[in-house]
Amino acid sequence: MINNRVRVAVTGAAGQIGYALVFRIASGQMFGPNTEVELNLLELEPALPSLEGVAMELDDCAFPLLKRIVCTADLNKAMDGVNWALLVGSVPRKQGMERSDLLQINGGIFTKQGQAINDYASDDVRVFVVGNPCNTNCLIAMNHAKDVPSDRFYAMTTLDELRARTQLAKKAGVDITAVTQMTIWGNHSATQYPDFYNAKINGTSAAQVINDETWLKETFVSTVQQRGAAVIKARGSSSAASAANAIITGVNHLVTDTPAGESFSMCRRSKGEYGVDEGLIFSFPCRREHGELKVVENLEFNDFGRERFNTTLNELRSERDTVKSLGLLD
């Protein structure tokens, strides 16, 4: 029984992630079988012919839940009346580019997107940032959407969490469903901390089940941190299908109450939890309870965990300070 309709903006919709994503949204995998979908697809002007091809394919799938497709290069039109803004598109880092260059280029993009969301999106809009560097891009967009409550902005560490769960399951020789409470702390970058001490395998600490601290501290952590680069090296381009899958999973987490005993990783605006500076977009362990997103409290760190936590926190502080110095934050 159809009981809802949602309008979704996807930026960079003709890119590899967008192409892997939009069909899954239209099929009902993101919002469920009882929610009709309208897609507002945004691309740069030169990519509009390719985007029209994506729209043709969406039509040809004859998805019963897909009720409307808008293809546009007009940011304001793309954000008009949307309930969800999936900010997938961003400028990738190129050889010889400093991180500050990347932050400045994308800062301009996400400034405009935040303003358009503020002025044109639905009053209940939620914003899910994927384009990298996603934590700080999310911070910039949030800063320029003053009328949208800050707790409606999220950035994605879902792919990192899924990568980490898979590595633990393989090492322990268990099914992927046995691995729970796998937290990614901090930044979606090579400083992220995949917290194997607080992760569970069949309800027991992963560090106890695997009992190979050298592998966990060195191989596991670095594999998760560097997985994106490894995919690029292997296939010649960045993660696309797995990123799209993680977007589906991440939004599922945000629209569905979390089962008892489970949690998920999500970047959200800090309110000071775990000593993180208020206002930073930081990945925490989260639960959705009765429609409200909450950070899981009272997890503990040993010296190794605290050091990794502080490293990723300091990187996010540095990114914030950089974009502030560039005039991208108030």
UniProtKB/Swiss-Prot annotation:
InterPro entries to which the protein is assigned, alphabetical = L-lactate/malate_DH, Lactate/malate_DH_C, Lactate/malate_DH_N, Lactate_DH/Glyco_Ohase_4_C, Malate_DH_AS, Malate_DH_type2, NAD(P)-bd_dom_sf
Q: Does the keyword Electron transport apply?
A: no
Provide the alphabetized UniProt keywords: NAD, Oxidoreductase, Tricarboxylic acid cycle
The EC number of this protein is: 1.1.1.37
Q: Which domain of life is it from?
A: Bacteria
Q: Which Pfam families match?
A: Ldh_1_C, Ldh_1_N
* Signal peptide segment: none
**Principal EC category:** oxidoreductase
Binding-site residues for NAD(+), renumbered to this chain: 12-18, 106, 113, 130-132
Residues annotated as catalytic:
188
What biological-process terms (Gene Ontology) are attached? Answer: malate metabolic process; tricarboxylic acid cycle
According to the UniProt entry, its GO molecular function terms are:
L-malate dehydrogenase (NAD+) activity
Reactions it catalyzes: (S)-malate + NAD(+) = oxaloacetate + NADH + H(+)
Q: SUPFAM superfamilies this protein is in?
A: LDH C-terminal domain-like, NAD(P)-binding Rossmann-fold domains
Name the residues that bind substrate. 93, 99, 132, 163
Q: Which CDD domains match?
A: MDH_chloroplast-like
Please name the HAMAP family in this protein's record. Malate_dehydrog_2 (MF_01517)
Q: What does this protein do?
A: Catalyzes the reversible oxidation of malate to oxaloacetate.
- State the family named in the UniProt similarity comment for this chain: Belongs to the LDH/MDH superfamily. MDH type 2 family.
Q: Which PANTHER family match?
A: MALATE DEHYDROGENASE
Q: What is this protein called?
A: Malate dehydrogenase
* Source organism phylogeny: Bacteria, Pseudomonadati, Pseudomonadota, Gammaproteobacteria, Legionellales
